[in-house]
């Protein structure tokens, strides 16, 4: 997904300008770099998120062992907002991807150009069996 965001930077900025009148500088600062930094940081932390955690068992169960294993829960529904359409929509999508979940993405209908760019990124760069965008 980060690759798609980088490749579609100009489209992201143009759609934001058409929908909200937001200048390219602010879009790049608040949405583009913030999102890429978020994805980069959490991608680096993936091993910490997925490793088993061994804990001390309850007194009743000694000498057994206890551990916590994190597993995907299923499908996430991500509802986007109109004021920060990329960050608020693609940030939870990145976390769904990193945690192994599928997602249904519903961008805001108040920003149709941004919603279309989100749909292009999802359809072009992510697995169509796991991630769907619903417009409207």
For every predicted segment, state its role.
Residues 1-64:
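N-terminal Rossmann-like NAD(P)+-binding subdomain of aldehyde/semialdehyde dehydrogenases
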Residues 56-136:
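Rossmann-like NAD(P) dinucleotide-binding subdomain of oxidoreductase/dehydrogenase enzymes
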């Amino acid at each position: 997904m980060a690759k798609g965001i980088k490749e579609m930077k100009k489209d992201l900025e143009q759609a934001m300008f058409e929908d909200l009148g937001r200048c390219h500088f602010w879009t790049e600062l608040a949405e583009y770099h913030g999102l890429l930094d978020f994805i980069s940081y959490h991608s680096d932390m993936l091993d910490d998120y997925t490793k088993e955690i061994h804990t001390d068992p309850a007194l009743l169960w000694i000498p057994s062992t206890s551990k916590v294993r994190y597993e995907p829960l299923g499908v996430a529904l991500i509802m986007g907002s109109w004021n920060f359409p990329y960050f608020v929509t693609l940030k939870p999508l990145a976390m769904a991807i990193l945690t192994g979940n599928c997602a249904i993405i519903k961008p805001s209908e108040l920003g149709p150009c941004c919603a279309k760019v989100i749909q292009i990124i999802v359809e072009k760069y992510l697995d169509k069996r796991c991630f769907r965008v619903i417009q409207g």
